[in-house]
Amino acid sequence: MRALLTAISAPGSSAVYCTVGDLDWWRYNDEPEAIALAHLWFTGDLLIGVAWPKNDQVDLLTHPHHRDIEASMVSWAERARRARAGAGGEALPLRAWTYDGDVPRTALLQAHGYARTATHFRYHSRPLDTPIPALPVPPGYTLRPVTGTADIEPRVAVHRAAFAPSRMSAARYHRLMGAPTYRADLDLIVVAPDSAFAAFCIVWFDAANRLGVFEPVGTHPAHRRRGLGQAILYEGLRRLRQLGARTAYVNSYGGDEAAERLYTSVGFQLVDRNYAWEKLL
């Protein structure tokens, strides 16, 4: 699956549905058995497609040279949705995702009876071809990477505060730290004067494609509007550039204008919008 995502994210690709870093965040931030629901498509020994269902939605990941399998993937996702629901007869919603700029998938979903909802994510990109400015944190705060398992409890606490309600737990975070793409030097935190964690981000580095993804990014409500988000993003961008990355990506939830302002303030530009399309089965 990682080889497929490397091909999907290759230089010259348009907006990307999932990088190797996204895969690690999705997989290790979920229940361990969730990946077992994914269905795979091969041509010979080459993996060319993955449909990963969860609840009432499905993520479709397709090799750029084999987009013709997506109709089969959608049909499978609909059958799997019905099978998971069991007998009952009620209408079942199923959501699939497509970028505005992904004309083939948009046309496919329309042909299968899907309609675009208002739910979407904004996909942002930033080149790393110029030096990254430094932005110091306010006096009394410090910015550093996590230092191992001793940081798990406060790291979980700030995540839960920033994204309440949240399923994040110490067990989940410990599992996340074992993900293949996870690097402690790219798991950044801002520590407040009282030693509590105030802001955080994880940067996932795809060395093959020289790109980085920020997921997640957050600030404790008690420490917002102090420039901590900008400072930690700039530090993540700086570290990516030192590793040889050429591009950084980040997503924000549609309608989250505070996140939009934050990301554009450090040089990210909106590339596309990834909409949920829904069908009642």
Residue ranges and their predicted role:
Residues 1-23, 134-168, 196:
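Short amphipathic alpha-helix that is part of the acyltransferase structural core
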Residues 5-87, 95-98, 193, 198-211, ...:
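Conserved donor-binding loop and adjoining core beta-sheet/short helix segment
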Residues 47, 54-139, 275-279:
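Acyl-donor-binding surface of acyltransferase catalytic domains
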Residues 94-97, 214, 248-252:
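Conserved hydrophobic beta-strand within the GNAT/NAT acetyltransferase core sheet
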Residues 105, 109, 263, 268:
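Conserved active-site tyrosine of GNAT-family acetyltransferases
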Residues 162-208, 217, 221, 230:
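Phosphate-binding active sites in nucleotide-utilizing proteins
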Residues 173, 233, 256-259, 278-281:
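Short glycine/proline-centered loop/turn elements that form peptide/ligand docking sites
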